[in-house]
Amino acid sequence: VVELYEERDTSRPAFLYNLTYQNHGGYEQAAFNGGNWEVDPEHRVRVTEGFDEVRGQAEEYLSCLTYTDDAFAGLIDYFSQQKDPVIICMVGDHIPHFTGDVESEYSGLEYQMRSRGTPFVIWANYPLEEENVGYIGMSQLAPLLLQTAEIPLSPFYQSLAELSQDVPVLTRDFYRLSTGDFAIYLFTEMPEENPLLRRYLYFENYLVHCRGADMYGLSVPYAGTTESGDFSA
């Protein structure tokens, strides 16, 4: 990220979408190395209680998180020293799948919310108003980021921003209203009671099926939600 930033065209603004599999499963390195896997002692996390059946996976996942913490801290430290205004948004899309083997308290819709609920942070190297936006859907994160950067929204993102006032969370299986109520729906069914949601689904259908597959990633709501949002300057 730093290398791409330093090689950018400084005559114009730059945008970088960086996807990493750093902490993605499976978490089974020890199973292929006789119970051992290489990790620096300062990053090694050991689970001493619980997680009996998946303890190795839990330890690997948590140890990987310590690497991510250090890397993100280094990234923030670097950009905090840059003169150009910079905004960074960091988010994950779901928690580890092995938690389903040990978590039996939740099921159905509530389990989906908890397993797909992840925190996110929007940080800038200049002052931002601190705010916790609560639950929002992954598809709502892009317009929120653009608004934070004071970048004009396209008609599509304007539609998403308007929809988020009433339907802050929208996934492939359900949506959550601003009242906190949930509704389960199928993509084959058109919600008659919410005109903004109907407009969004029409918009989505146009972008996906009429504009071509290259628009797919821009428009389809992903089954991920943020459990908590945090603005920090």
Regions found by a protein language model. Give the residues of each.
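Solvent-exposed soluble domains appended to multi-pass membrane proteins
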Residues: V1-A233
